[in-house]
Amino acid sequence: MFLALTQDIPLDHVVPLAQYNHRVSIANTGTFALLSNICPHQNSRIAKCSTEHLQCPYHGLTFDRNGLGINNRYSLEKWPVYKNQTILFDQHVGCAFPIDTQHMTLVEHRQDTISATPDVIMDVFLDIEHIPVAHAGVYDQIGITNVDKITWFTFDNGSIQFVPAQEKTSMIQDDEKYNIGACWMAVYPGTMIEWQPGALFVTVAHNTNETSSQVQVYKYRDTRYSQDVWELNNHVWETAWSQDRALAEFIESPAVDNLDELKQHHRVWSQDAV
């Protein structure tokens, strides 16, 4: 699951994560690690926001940024973090993200609620054939007018799709070398990463109940591109996301027949993960 970009987490800070309902934090001590945000003394949450100091608000117990108790016998549970470019995950991801993400800066983080399960949301994300139907004309605005030649491949816990570069009028020289107009990466379960020249959009879907999901939305701007390029990217992505949300809510349940290879791959992974 996506956690953050390295540049989101200041050095010597601990940041609670919405993906874990703020029960887990990510710590940056020069290396990254996940820490429980629950005090083992009386099960109170510790941090409310990014902080340099971990002190439980209930009885005042303090911990260092490695999770060790300070003048107390307790310690916080700790888990590894996996770095992929500057993208941080709570799991190993079997494919390096192909685009340099070091210039991305977080513009917005929000939570959306969708009346669809994470599996249905992922199905829509993986589905290539719906693009010219559900998103007719949307991606034309960023120079993607033909999605017939999308290429893709799978890896152990996800897949990645590449849209060939078409019009490069707003693409900086550093990004022209990729020859990619867009890149869409799925990391199971529930993480969807979308790159357009000048922007990165990440969605992380979790069940809230049997029929709905909470989706953490992270929107990043590449600081090498102009504000106008960002605003166009943001408009295109929000339009496509609203269309995909509506489509997901219209799907009764994940399909079991007529599955393309990307959906089949996700089904096999889901079955093996049980």
List the predicted regions and their residue ranges.
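C-terminal catalytic domain of Rieske-type non-heme iron oxygenases
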Residues: 37, 95-274
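Rieske [2Fe-2S] iron-sulfur-binding domain
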Residues: 5-98, 200, 224
